[in-house]
């Protein structure tokens, strides 16, 4: 049996016209990096998040790295992260100079288990990187 890694064709089919139009407009503009499309995204996203600022980045690794650096997290600091996660979570922590501390997940959800976080916290712990998976949100209230 062959199981597709991340079949997003159904989502694409629902948005095909909008996606194709946006890509063509971007290509015709000649701006593939930064430019008005990114500015528009940043402005709209900041407004949607009710915050004055937004910076578009190239990847999730870049986003995690910049967030941690912006929080002053660096060498000597630990960041708790679920053991079941994609590599960008770990890479972002390492690029910020911190050490990832892998914590086991809940066997029913695959999400970070709040009951196991407390045991992993040390004097060097500066952050917990919660990873939401498969349409499920982590129990942030108990973290």
Predicted segments with their positions:
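Short alpha-helical
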Residues: 10, 14, 40, 62, ...
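Phosphate-binding glycine-rich loop
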Residues: 31-78, 92-96, 102-104
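Solvent-exposed, non-membrane alpha-helical residues enriched in polar/charged side chains
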Residues: 20, 24, 28, 42-46, ...
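N-terminal "arm"/small-domain region of PLP-dependent enzymes with the aminotransferase-like
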Residues: 1-29
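PLP-dependent aminotransferase-like
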Residues: 69-143
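PLP-dependent aminotransferase class I/II
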Residues: 9, 38-43, 48-54, 115, ...
